[in-house]
């Protein structure tokens, strides 16, 4: 069953219309050394039935594993209703329409999302989402520079305890923006930003300070101290947070005396399944004073000429919609389907449900850490408060231990030594509400067995 729509006669007619004698002539401008030539090793085409059979055979090779890995993407239970509704034809589309007001249902969902996210973060306003948590931080940094004209600095204080992947993305996004990223070290004994490290910097030296909560080690930062330090020194405070944790911890809008200026992060924990790194979505919230500098889009509620309530794109300061020089971002669209799922997840869970999930995550992670550190040679790296991740030190090479656990059907965590060689054979472990006592016992037994090999 071929699905190529054009007949040979139609192809000839199209070539004749543009004055080309053949397909090869059409692409003659491409230098020969750039052409791939014949694909001699390409197998014969398969029928739809044969393709389905092949995919089933390949899928049968997949191995499911018990997951104790986190480091930025987390396995949470997603109520069945979330994706049952999100995949309905009213929401499920290839692209958000350019005539956005024609899709009142989608706009209302985005509006409700903005309201929920702003409430969860205790901030004034939220945009309609960005690509992912890392790019959201990059946009937040650029936004902080735009909203801080009093500071002539282009320096951003970036903690080493921030997710290293986020740092790499931020470096890419700011490389040609005259932004200088300055490392802020962490306390080796506690795993959080070292207060004495702040004392080495002069007042007014930075345009913004990035504050992760929890940080990459799972440790809770002294957010009040950091936010107040930023404001005393004329810098914007940028919170990078786990949205699930904010149901239990103090939200960014309440940090210190004045609250954080911006809050961003990865929205994947809010109803988005793990899927080879994406698609996920990023969120970005700010003070009302900075609303005109928000990247992406902002949905607002209004009334039409007949007095009926409706929803519209109140702000869309992207370069496709306004003059390039006036645009605040080149973010092309938002992760509309992911935001729809997140809105449904938050609505179905409610404030109490989100708090219960967050509390269960913390309780399970605490139980996991206690269970694993009973094993000889395994110890916590940082004796500090954490949310649902913690670092443990192993008596053997962490990467080999992970490989041994994988052979036993367990994703044991994330090796930290690649980005933090000073920590030695440290492993970042995670437990969400989906991990029970039996899972932890299985992990502990497998870890003990691997360490004895």
UniProtKB/Swiss-Prot annotation:
Similarity comment: family membership: Belongs to the GcvP family. N-terminal subunit subfamily.
CDD domains, alphabetized: GDC-P (cd00613)
Keyword Oxidoreductase: yes
Highest taxon of the lineage: Bacteria
Taxon lineage: Bacteria, Pseudomonadati, Pseudomonadota, Gammaproteobacteria, Methylococcales
One GO process term, biological-process aspect: glycine decarboxylation via glycine cleavage system
Enzyme class: oxidoreductase
Native species: Methylococcus capsulatus (strain ATCC 33009 / NCIMB 11132 / Bath)
Record keywords, A-Z: Oxidoreductase
Subunit structure: The glycine cleavage system is composed of four proteins: P, T, L and H. In this organism, the P 'protein' is a heterodimer of two subunits.
Catalytically driven reaction(s): N(6)-[(R)-lipoyl]-L-lysyl-[glycine-cleavage complex H protein] + glycine + H(+) = N(6)-[(R)-S(8)-aminomethyldihydrolipoyl]-L-lysyl-[glycine-cleavage complex H protein] + CO2
HAMAP family: GcvPA
InterPro entries: GcvPA, GDC-P_N, GDC_P, PyrdxlP-dep_Trfase, PyrdxlP-dep_Trfase_major, PyrdxlP-dep_Trfase_small
UniProt KW RNA-binding keyword: no
Name the UniProt record assigns to this protein: Probable glycine dehydrogenase (decarboxylating) subunit 1
Enzyme Commission number, as recorded: 1.4.4.2
Gene name in the database record: gcvPA
Protein function: The glycine cleavage system catalyzes the degradation of glycine. The P protein binds the alpha-amino group of glycine through its pyridoxal phosphate cofactor; CO(2) is released and the remaining methylamine moiety is then transferred to the lipoamide cofactor of the H protein.
One Pfam short name: GDC-P
Any one GO molecular-function label of the UniProt entry: glycine dehydrogenase (decarboxylating) activity
């Amino acid at each position: 069953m071929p699905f190529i729509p054009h007949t040979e006669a139609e192809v000839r007619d199209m070539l004749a219309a543009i004055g080309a004698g053949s397909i090869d002539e059409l692409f003659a401008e491409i230098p020969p050394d750039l052409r791939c030539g014949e694909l001699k090793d390409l197998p014969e085409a398969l029928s739809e039935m044969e393709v389905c059979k092949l995919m089933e055979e390949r899928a049968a090779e997949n191995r499911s594993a018990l997951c104790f890995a986190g480091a930025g993407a987390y396995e949470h239970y997603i109520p069945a209703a979330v994706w049952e509704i999100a995949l309905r034809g009213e929401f499920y589309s290839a692209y958000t329409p350019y005539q956005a007001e024609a899709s009142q249902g989608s706009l209302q969902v985005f509006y409700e999302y903005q309201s929920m996210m702003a409430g969860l973060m205790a901030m004034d306003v939220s945009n309609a989402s960005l690509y992912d948590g890392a790019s959201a931080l990059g946009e937040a940094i650029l936004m902080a520079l735009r909203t801080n004209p009093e500071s002539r600095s282009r320096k951003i204080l970036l903690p080493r305890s921030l997710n290293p992947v986020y740092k790499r993305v931020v470096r890419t996004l700011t490389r040609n923006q005259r932004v200088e990223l300055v490392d802020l070290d962490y306390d080796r004994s506690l795993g959080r930003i070292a207060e004495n490290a702040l004392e080495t910097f002069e007042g007014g030296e930075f345009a913004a300070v990035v504050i992760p909560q929890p940080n990459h080690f799972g440790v809770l930062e002294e957010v009040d101290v950091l936010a107040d330090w930023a404001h005393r020194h004329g810098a914007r405070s940028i919170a990078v947070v786990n949205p699930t944790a904010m149901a239990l911890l103090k939200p960014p809008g309440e940090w210190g005396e004045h609250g954080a200026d911006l809050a961003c992060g990865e929205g994947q924990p809010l109803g988005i399944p793990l899927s080879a790194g994406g698609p996920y979505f990023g969120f970005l919230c700010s003070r009302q004073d900075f609303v005109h500098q928000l990247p992406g889009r902002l949905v607002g509620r209004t009334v039409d000429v007949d007095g009926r309530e409706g929803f519209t794109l109140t702000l869309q300061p992207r370069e496709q919609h306004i003059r390039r020089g006036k645009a605040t971002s080149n973010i092309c669209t938002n992760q509309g389907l992911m935001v729809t799922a997140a809105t449904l997840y938050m609505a179905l869970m409610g404030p109490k449900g989100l708090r219960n999930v967050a509390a269960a995550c913390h309780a399970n992670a605490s139980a996991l850490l206690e269970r694993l550190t009973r094993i000889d040679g395994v110890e916590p790296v940082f004796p500090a408060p954490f949310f649902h991740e913690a670092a443990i030190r192993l008596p053997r090479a962490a990467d080999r231990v992970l490989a041994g656990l994988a052979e036993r059907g367990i994703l044991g965590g994330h090796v930290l030594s690649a980005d933090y060689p000073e920590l030695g054979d440290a492993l970042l472990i995670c437990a969400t509400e989906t991990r029970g006592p039996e899972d932890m016992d299985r992990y502990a037994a497998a870890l003990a067995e691997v360490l004895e090999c």
